[in-house]
Amino acid sequence: RAAYLSGGGFGAIGHSSFIMIPSILSLNIIKAAVMGWGGTQFLIYGSMDRREFIGRFLKRAGIGVGAGAAVTAGLVGYYQPRRELYSSGPRSADASQTMPEGKRCVVIGGGLAGISAALELAKKGACVTLVESSGALGGKLTGWEIEALGEQMPVEHGFHGFFDQYYNLNEMFASAGITDDVFDASPGYPVLFRERPAETYGQTPKVFPFNILSVVGQSRSLDIASFLREYRGLLPVVSMFGYQYGKTFREYDGINFMEYCRKGEILPAFIDTVLHPFADATMNRMEVLSAAEAIRYFHFYFMGSPEGLSFNITNRDCMTALINPLEVKLRELGVTVLSGHRALSLKVEGERIAGVAVQGAGGSGEILHVSPADVQDSGWTSLVSREGVPVLVKREGGGYLAFDARCTHMGCPVVPDESGGFFCPCHAGRFSSNGDVLGGPPPAALVRLSVKSGDGMLVLHSPEGGGGTAEKLLECDYCVMATDVRGTREIVGNSSLASPSFEKSVADLGEADPYAVYRIWLDKPIDSASFPFYTVSGYTYTDSISLYSAFQEPYISWAGKTGGCVVELHAYAIAPEDMRPEEEIKAAMIAEMHHMFLETEGVRVLHELFMIQSNFTRWAPGDHAGRPGVETPFSNLFLAGDWVRVEAPVFLMEAAAFTGRMAANAVFRSEGVEQVPLPIVPMDGIFA
């Protein structure tokens, strides 16, 4: 299959088809017809039979231009993206339906990847133990309750959209009895720009090329004629339709996506209107995002997707709607869920993992040796153990006071605050100077460490007794490590694996720049906001705005009672040069909201929740080649998570669910058990 541009014409060869658009006029005919239909009719036509679509297209275009439109409509006969099944390895015709009795599987990490793996393993009869350091499952979808204005309200890490091409994730939800009534379809995909009018992309057709043309047709800033006048800038856009895993990563993983766009002289309006705001949703800035990963991202979400540009949103919080039912299903299948337990290291015997060392209650353990000279004379000194455990130490009354600085909610490092206590910037947990919980989601106080002197060094221990942590070994036949990047690095770093190349591949993994979520309760509605969710472009911090009081309970009810609204401002990836103290970032985001919605100038903030965190996967140029895959040098250790290298075109939450299933399939192959089908969007782009 190939595609080429020649003068003012466009040609494509695919399978046995040959279609040509001989002139700019033909393309403008399509655009005129597309623009005339409107967003509502896109939704209707998107699910039509192809011939019916063509018929209505020609009728709409009019008899006078029918001949030209007929030529271009032949594009619909070209290869259409269709759902496929990914092959994750050889399958046996006589495979068993269940695992051999008594096979023990330990899954580390209770996010979507870990839940996905645990569910599939348990369905086939494995004895599964799921270990999660946080007090609740869910990972980036987890949530908790806070008290806001006298009411208990659920909060989470930020807005999540659920796309139709999340095939494996949606199947996982369905297996837990989660039905469509927890979702509502988003009415459109609006983009707010700082320096130009807003763009709104309605539901797009699922039929190529009308899905692409509809985006151009709905845009105020784009038109086909401009693209063809700037034909050099069109070539790299066309090449994005030629996504092919091996070729794309060989050619483009060495440069960032902004460089790719600039070198290709892509039409600036297309970069600003489409590529930049959509690429930011990878949680990586274009300037540090691998061009190959960006091309895969666009292939998965739009250019190679048979599902169109549509997504769903939950009408209640994600814990209630999604995670709690998944946990119920896990327990129904017999999974032992160890939430609030931290996996420390892997025990190796030969080329196999024999077990997982886990922190439980009731013991003691040495954490850190430190010289007294390294502890500052006043205030808290922040230290990190060899295993990556953050510690806070200070001099007090001729002795020393020390805390394990991991928040008891999800293990994020806490920092001293102005009140003399401690603050978790990830989820707004607050602790007193004694480590007691003052507010937010942490379920327990910080762990106070014992400090002993010996041989001129300070030795920091977990305390003796119930407040401490004891190590226990979970023996296993198989282990799936489905932690995030930071957790995986810590566990592998703590384990004596004697596998330098694998250990380096994990150590080299990184997180994207920090993201910030700022949820605010306002005393007045934002009447001009007609959508529940907006992508934002051109501002220093804000990348999206979600109006929770427009789509999710209990915020809808709260707004109805008070006349106010609840808004969430989300910064996807804050550049190092833009990092500021919390109050400055909050003030800047409020000012950006005022610029987007002028009526908010006079509103009062009644309550707020601000969190900043860095746990999304980094997709930097050059990362891909060294990224570890699902299989490891150990025959019974498998990896899962959105950060794991896979050939399939998957991303974000779908990548987590997909790799969880891949890890389960690797176990099934080893035991001669039937594997789980893995649906995906097409492996290759339409011009590959």
Regions from the PLM with identified roles:
Residues 103-130:
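N-terminal Rossmann-like FAD-binding beta1-loop-alpha1 element of flavoenzymes
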Residues 47-105, 123, 688:
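Extreme N-terminal leader/targeting segments of oxidoreductases
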Residues 341-364, 373, 469-565, 576-578, ...:
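Mid-domain catalytic core of redox enzymes
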Residues 361-419, 445-468:
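N-terminal pre-ligand scaffold of iron-sulfur
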Residues 174-175, 180-295:
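Mobile amphipathic helical/loop "lid" adjacent to a hydrophobic cofactor/ligand pocket
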Residues 300-363, 452, 464-474:
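Helical element adjacent to the flavin cofactor pocket in flavoenzyme catalytic cores
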Residues 122-145:
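Glycine-rich FAD pyrophosphate-binding loop
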